[in-house]
Amino acid sequence: MLDELDGAMIISKTLTKTDIVGNVALPKAQVMSVLTRMNGVTDEGLDNGFEVQVHDIMEDDLYTVTLKRIDDMKYYFGTGWSTMKHSLDLVEGDVLKLYWDQFENKFIVLNF
């Protein structure tokens, strides 16, 4: 399966202490690449925050997190991130890897 994934649809982030204790900041270039294949995303939606699904296929858990943009510069997961990070047992230094599945319209967790 991994050989078939489009690298432009992957968001990868080494988690910092700030990401663990608060909201996770996401790499701008990677998020912008994924946004090109997301349906129904608007500037207003990004500024206000919009819900996306994140599927942990190993545990068959589905999370809902809010993707938000600040000042056209920073992207992050807000609401829902806390539940997701605790369920995935993520700690500082871990690499969060997510793949945007444009056909299912959700992220797939690649941390396995």
Swiss-Prot record:
Residue ranges of DNA binding: 19-112
Name of the protein this chain belongs to: B3 domain-containing protein At1g43171
SMART domains: B3
InterPro entries: B3_DNA-bd, B3_domain, DNA-bd_pseudobarrel_sf
UniProt entry keywords in alphabetical sequence: DNA-binding, Nucleus, Transcription, Transcription regulation
Coiled coil: none
Compartments reported by the entry: Nucleus
GO molecular function ontology, one term from the record: DNA binding
Highest taxon above the source species: Eukaryota
Organism: Arabidopsis thaliana (Mouse-ear cress)
Record's GO cellular component terms: nucleus
